[in-house]
């Protein structure tokens, strides 16, 4: 699996005002989740020279290597996340250099997980992946969160676009929350928005997260799972979902099992009630939850 996303340093302030510094971003949450499934992980990422040796050692000890050429002059991407009772505020503190087409050349993988955190995957890089995928028929999963984010030049506070005219040609699967789904579909939501991405954009697997539900649309089947968990920190849950879904589908070629493993991984992570990367769940706990959801998942033939 190759993951395109910047590694980030997160400063997470919880409801009580406590601040936790943690490595983060899809590269870390998704990469470490994929390692739990026994997958080889290649990160297409960049960090700054401020990225500490202990962080490099931590990733290496968990089977993920940061190569020398991935360390650049720009600072490592950093966010401050403030978690309140009813909402979360995100601020960009520093941003690393964008990824380039040269960064993805000579990478051999059966799955691309494209999940920018703040526009570091330009349109030409995404197009190059899709073009390469057309030749090899690999799996391309997209999480559009980084394309949605707009940074206030004065405060660094991040807001979201209302409209995202993103070319989804060649994308195999997409994960989108309520705001992302509306931006990608011209304001549509729920099942209607998912069907639009499938029929009009050609996305084979559409995953939607809204409130405490995870939905999957594949062909004419709509599946949904309820996650009713109160947690102090859900940072990285979407990244864990995307990676677990990809791993399970690549291994089993069964979308039903894949969404059960995705939801199972999210539940296992949130049940730890830990912050940052400490919430990465074990494979055994993921499997336990996946088997439970396989027997309780709701579905509808459209």
Predicted feature locations:
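Alpha-helix C-terminal capping segments
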Residues: 31-40, 248-251
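Short, hydrophobic/glycine-enriched beta-strand segments
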Residues: 1-8, 141
